[in-house]
Structure formats: C-alpha cells, structure tokens
Curated annotation (Swiss-Prot):
Pathway: Secondary metabolite biosynthesis
Molecular-function GO terms, alphabetical: prenyltransferase activity
Family affiliation: Belongs to the tryptophan dimethylallyltransferase family.
Function: Prenyltransferase; part of the gene cluster that mediates the biosynthesis of neosartoricin B, a prenylated anthracenone that probably exhibits T-cell antiproliferative activity, suggestive of a physiological role as an immunosuppressive agent. The non-reducing polyketide synthase nscA probably synthesizes and cyclizes the decaketide backbone. The hydrolase nscB then mediates the product release through hydrolysis followed by spontaneous decarboxylation. The prenyltransferase nscD catalyzes the addition of the dimethylallyl group to the aromatic C5.
Lineage: superkingdom: Eukaryota
Protein name: Prenyltransferase nscD
GO biological process, one term: alkaloid metabolic process
Presence of the UniProt keyword Transferase in the record: yes
InterPro entries reported for this sequence: Aro_prenylTrfase, Aro_prenylTrfase_DMATS, DMATS-type_fun
Amino acid sequence: MSSLPMFDSVSRFLPTANEDEQFWWKLTGRHMARMMHEAGYPEDRQVECLLFHRFKVVPCLGPRPHSDKPWYKSRVGGGAADGCPINYSWRFGTSDRKPHIRNFIEPLGALTNTPADPLNEVATKALLRDYSMTLPNVDLELFWTFAPHYRPRIIEKADMEKLAGASLLVGAEMSPDSRNIDIKAYMYPRVPSQTSQLLTTILPQAMRDAYGEDVCLDSLNLVRDFMTNDPEGSQLTLTGTTGIDCCKLQDTRVKIYVITRNTSFDHIAAIMTLGGRRPISEELLNQLRALWFELKGAPADFTSSEQLPAQTKPDGTKNPIVVPFYFDIQPRLALPDVKAYVDVSTSPVSDLAAAEAVVRHLERHGSGQNPKAYMNVLQDITPVEELETRKGALAFYSIAVKKNELDITSYFNPQVYKRYFAHEVQLNGQRRSAFE
C-alpha cells in the first residue's frame, strides 16, 4: 500500500499526546488519511480534516484498548461492530461527484459508564457545543430543541438502570470540495413508549417547537399515513432513531429510521417508492434488485416476491434478516426521500465478495468515481484474508436514488477490539497487540 505523506507530515509536528490519544491517532488517523488519499482530496483539505480529527475527535474516543473486550460497548456500527466508539463511511457518490467520507462516533468522557451519566450524554453534548463554537457552519438550534423530547422522564433508579446505554451519536462529514465540516446528531429514545409515540406526538411537537407552530408537516404526515394504511408500509417498525443536521434551521433535515422483516424485493421496492408516490424507473429498480440479490447471496433469478432465506449461525439457530430504511423529512418538501440499508453482517457472502459486488455494479453502470479506490481503503484497514473469511469489517451499504442513478454508501468498522489479538506475538510471556 502506498505511503500517506499528509498523515506523516501532520504527525511530525503534533505535540506529544497521552498514551490513549496517541493510540487512537495512529490507528484512526491513518484510516482517515487513507480514505482521503484514495478519494483524491486536495492536499490542503486532507491536512485540515486530519487536524480536525486529531484535536476534535481523537480526545473523545476514551481509553485505548487493553484487551479484546471493550470497557464500554458503544452503539456505533450496529450489530457488526465490536464496541469500538468510531466507524467510517465512504459515499461513492455519483458520476459527477468525488467520494465523500464521514466518521461516526459515540463520544466517551469521564462520566461515561457511570451512574452520573447513564445515557452517556455529557461528553456528546460538550463535543457538540465545542463544534458550534469552532465550526462556523454548525448550528445547534434544532438539536437543543429536539433533545428534551427524546430524553426519558424517569426518576426510579431501577428503571433508569434498565435503560442505561447510548442515547446520542455524532457524525462528521468531510466533503472534498468544501471548507466546512458538516455535523449530524443521532438520538435514541430509551423508553419503548417514546418510540411508539414518535410519529404521533414527539416529532410533531418537536418540529413545531423548532420551526414554529405553522410548520408544514405534510412530509411527516405522509410517512405516518404510509406506515398506518399502506399494506407494505404497515409492515415497517419504528426503531426510534432520529438523525438531524446541525446546521441553519432552514437547511436541516430530520431522518426517521425504521425496519422491516419482509425481505422480498417487491416489498423493498414498495418502501423505496412509498407505495408508488415516489416513482423509480424500471431500469433503476432492476439495478437495485440485482445488487440486493447479490449482496444477500441470492441467485439473480430469485423470485422477487419470495422471502430471502435466513442465514444459519454456527450454533444452528437462524439469523433473521432485518432491513433498515430511513425517511428524510424536510418541512419545505411534501415528499420524503427514502434510503435503504443492506446489512452485510447477516448475509452469507463474505465482506470481500460484497465489496466486489458493489464495485462491479458501479463500474458496470458508469457510476461513482474510481470505485476501486474504495477497495484500497478496505484492504488497508482489514487484511484481504480476513475480508474473505470473517465478518465484521463491513456493517451496511445504504442505497438511495439520486439524479437517476443509485447513490451508494459503505459503512465499515475498524474492528479495534475484534482484531486486538489478530497478529499476537509472544514477548516475555505477554500478549502484544498488533496495534502496538
């Protein structure tokens, strides 16, 4: 793999860091540098984003690993992850746009995993406030308005202990042709009753509080109607997860995440088109079907009305397939955008085969720019033999329709804990991490 001159130059003049920050910088800083290098980011943008990562992300990643078991299991990365508080995404983009990279973190602080901060909110809110003071494009008005609506109103200690866990995540998008770093926040209601009230009570009131009493809720109401009355939409289940943009109020989006357990492609297509309300060309639906079947290990002629077979785990039990989506709500738009997620961790195909399938699709249809650069990134983070034989590097592929082509993003994990002893050596009877 080629060298990373920007990472080496930045590292050369950094002040001495503590052991934890030094570990996270050497590992995740190199990952970020590799992604930007392969994506063709301008050199000055690479330096800018690396400095942001070093001073605004790395200090929030907590103690360095000292075993293959996380001291706090972060929610970042979904079911494929190993508890590491950071993962990455590579948006292939479209034929006229370079790849965009992002990272997602759950900030960890002094109060994380203690009774003083059972929902792990303190470090995240402090980080967001810091971003709002140092990044001129960041505006937290929507976040501060929404956050109280998602917080559980519980005073009983036993109840709070049951609900302890991640309630907030932060995403940072670093596009190649901008001076901005775009921040996103993700909220998770911990009380089940809050999730069931999301579309009927919580979101309508939160949006009125944020945008004003006369805010147009047509897009939100359409989602609620679709999930209530449409035979396909009524099979969706709210997860409670809500994503928002931390920018000027007039430009913000609200993302509502749902899942379905119906894995037939006809059902997937019905959700993507909102039951025909958002038409997608037959050509694009055919592309989506072919990619869906390939990523899920189904033959190309698999019947579109049939359910995909569940994967059998090593212990003989079945691994049910869940398909996530999100609806992108914007008050100024009557129709929400829809994005589907393909969970690679529940697929019988290897991580390498899944990645190669996506690259073939992009090359076949002339989409994206230099999709093989993505393979260089994956193989730099995880050895090829592990991509071929193990699961966990890839989390999801998301698929949306933009400008009459499929817009695909890959979400992948550094596997800091899972690979801790991957290349262990014996040194004076001690195990030694491959990252040391």
